[in-house]
Amino acid sequence: MISPDQQYETDTNLYNPSEIEKKWQSIWTENNLYKTDELTDNSDKFYALSMFPYPSGNLHMGHVRNYVITDLIARFQRFKGKSVLHPMGWDAFGLPAENAAIERGISPSVWTKKNISHMKSQLKLLGLSVDWDREFATCDENYYVWTQYLFLELYKAGLVYQKESEVNWDPIDNTVLANEQVDSEGKSWRSGAIVEKKLLKQWFLRITNYADELLKDLEKLDNWPERVKIMQDNWIGKSIGTNINFNINTHPEKKLTVFTTRPDTLFGVTYLAISVNHSLIKNISDQETIQHIENLKKYLKKNKNNELEKIGIKTSLIAINPVNSEPIPIWVASYVLDEYGTGAVMGVPAHDLRDFEFAKKNNIDIKQVIIKDKSEQNKELDEAYVENGYLINSNQYDGVANTIAKLKISEEGVNNRWAENKTQYRLRDWLISRQRYWGCPIPIVNCKKCGSVPLNQSELPVALPKDIDISANKINALGDNKNWVNTTCPKCGIAAKKETDTMDTFMCSSWYFLRYPSSKCPNKPFEKIEINKWLPVDQYVGGVEHAILHLLYARFFTKALRDNQLFEIDEPFKKLLTQGMVQAAAYKNNKTGKYVSPSDINDLSNPTDPIDNTKLEILFEKMSKSKYNGIDPESVIKKYGADTARMFILFKAPPEKDLEWGDTDVEGQFRFLSRIWKLYINCAKNVNIKSNSYPDKEKSLIKSMNIAIKEISNDILNNQFNTAISELMKFYNSLSNSINDVNNNLKIDALKTFCILLAPFAPHIAEEIWHLIGFKKSVHLEHWPSFNAEALKEDSYELVIQVNGKVREKVNINHDMNEDQIKELTLKRPNILKWTKDKEIRKIIIVKGKIMNIVV
């Protein structure tokens, strides 16, 4: 509770956000205003969470948008009487910190903790309603001990394994990347390096065990953006089809298995294509063919990020089509991927666009086996026919609809053992090994006698060593640290070595939301009872770029830990909001391709490059140092205040859309808050002076106030924060126009209501003006107002008047008029008399509140 002696006198009529915001932030902290209430059950809880930040050192506007959106939602729910959990932490492990530490010659721990301290102070400037008592960083030993604990839980459940595999290697960061961390151009998600392939022994999690549930349960996520669900659906990539086994004529002991979703086209297969690394290639003896394949490998490696030519190499290998015993040549093709399916595909040129192009280029037969309707004749195709139809050239299946033939041919194959039904996923197991120091150590000991042995949970944590050399040329800093790496086997007791790989940072962020409800729990990762009370997260806010990394991994972790009986929830995040980017004007010289700093441009309305006088293109792009278009949040807060920054961020664009920074828009919000300030300063001086009261003004203000309550409440619930602020502005206009013309009770009620409605958006000024008009408790401890539906009723309505069914006029009618009064008012109107004069009115039909029809 905020006591009266904590109030401050206002010495100036000018709005001074710096003074106001510092004052209230201090008082809120002192009074533990945002400490989370204890929950007895989960009926009145609301868990609001932003994706926690990586401590890069400085807050940027993208951060501000994320945290302000979540804060608004958390504050609103607290006003609605919910017990709100709104925590904050730090995603602190990872390569950026390690690389920054190497550059500066300091430890990643020192670098990270310094950045956390600075960013926390910046976040506090925003006036967030965060419960800082629950704060943690993933690099804290008392956090990552539980990441190791959960790793062992997954190990016991059979979800962790190690294997040697070809992996994505980042040559700049010297570490392995998961498939999800390689972009569509084959580049590292972080360093931007061209990713290479390397053979290493790695640790994996069996996320594929949950592929079907992860896919199916997307249907439960009604409050997730559709595009995020589509991205996850595509990434999981479920295909229901058939594995077809082709015998190899030249090598009877061998079989070539091909996955297909189109067994109905099996009679149209005129070639099979395999990848450059397929195991069958070992059976090719012709040296010229082998050399061509080697050349193709080099071409693929060199051009992996470019559009590939459809290159084919015909081999001496011949397969046998199981449906008709016809020979099929086997080709090595540039478009076949090692990692998808079996590394081999059927070539059906007549009914696949890619196969048609490949066949035309390489002079391969094209055999049509599906026609649009039965009356069509077999003819030479100008392009692949990819629609449904009826089979031809397919023996006993001729004339059968291809959708039916698909099932029948598959059934024949299963019965005759040359096919099996198969469900296939694009999703691959999650590779979690990283060959760097600054990550969570993997709690495994490598013993020459026992192999890889998991530690007992009582032996945790495996702490990172502090005496470590992580200079730039060190590939395996942990392995080279003899004091740390040498240990004894927990199984047999002989000399052994600790695992020197660390975990992917996404391991730490895949469960952090489970820690907050019991963040101080000393002997387990979380209290089950607290998880079952607080989870799932009611509102999660973060960038769409995490759709197939963090969000998919977090869903997997939740399901896997549920199956280990650690809690009962199925999904971690009930409602997801993916905010758009914050963009600002960037000035680009299209001749040089370089960006020019605005500070170097004389006239921003007609920008030219000061070096070569070229006219610059103005682009709105994501803020970045390289484009000279970053806006420092601290400088904005210093100049205009946090409340102005918050109002701008929330008003400028709907939260899911990209937001374009504009100084004039920021100034507009500052002026709006200044007008509010001036109104309340004047009201504070005259709050007890009786006003003249005018019924019409009072009625209008009551109506405006109730409209504002209703619309702002609905807008916040629907994440339409920009329109909520528009409604707030309308209410302000009504309030300022009538404040001196209404009775004192209504004046106080309206001023009080406006304060509460403003508070989630601009919490500091709302608190200050609340106390200016005489209230002692914090405005943030108030209840959200309810609207009065009666006050929203109109005095009159528009009545449509028809004569013989045709609209002739529209008239405003008071609600209290009866039918006789309505007739008396309307029948003598000139526009109606024009159509009824000298005519017999046979009937008048009135549908009150809507329409009146005069039949003449």
UniProtKB/Swiss-Prot annotation:
High-level lineage: Bacteria, Bacillati, Cyanobacteriota, Cyanophyceae, Synechococcales
Annotated GO CC locations: cytosol
Signal peptide: none
Motif 'KMSKS' region boundaries: 622-626
Keywords: Aminoacyl-tRNA synthetase, ATP-binding, Cytoplasm, Ligase, Nucleotide-binding, Protein biosynthesis
Ranges annotated as spanning the membrane: none
Ligase recorded as keyword: yes
The protein's Enzyme Commission number: 6.1.1.4
Residues that bind ATP: K625
Family: Belongs to the class-I aminoacyl-tRNA synthetase family.
Disulfide bonds: none
Entries under Gene3D superfamilies matching the protein: HUPs (3.40.50.620), Isoleucyl-tRNA Synthetase, Domain 1 (1.10.730.10)
PROSITE patterns named among the record's database cross-references: AA_TRNA_LIGASE_I (PS00178)
Enzyme's top EC category: ligase
Main location: cytoplasm
Organism field: Prochlorococcus marinus (strain MIT 9301)
Source organism superkingdom: Bacteria
Reaction equation(s) it catalyzes: tRNA(Leu) + L-leucine + ATP = L-leucyl-tRNA(Leu) + AMP + diphosphate
Short motif 'HIGH' region, span: 53-63
Subcellular location: Cytoplasm
Any one Gene Ontology molecular-function term assigned to this protein's record: leucine-tRNA ligase activity
UniProt protein name: Leucine--tRNA ligase
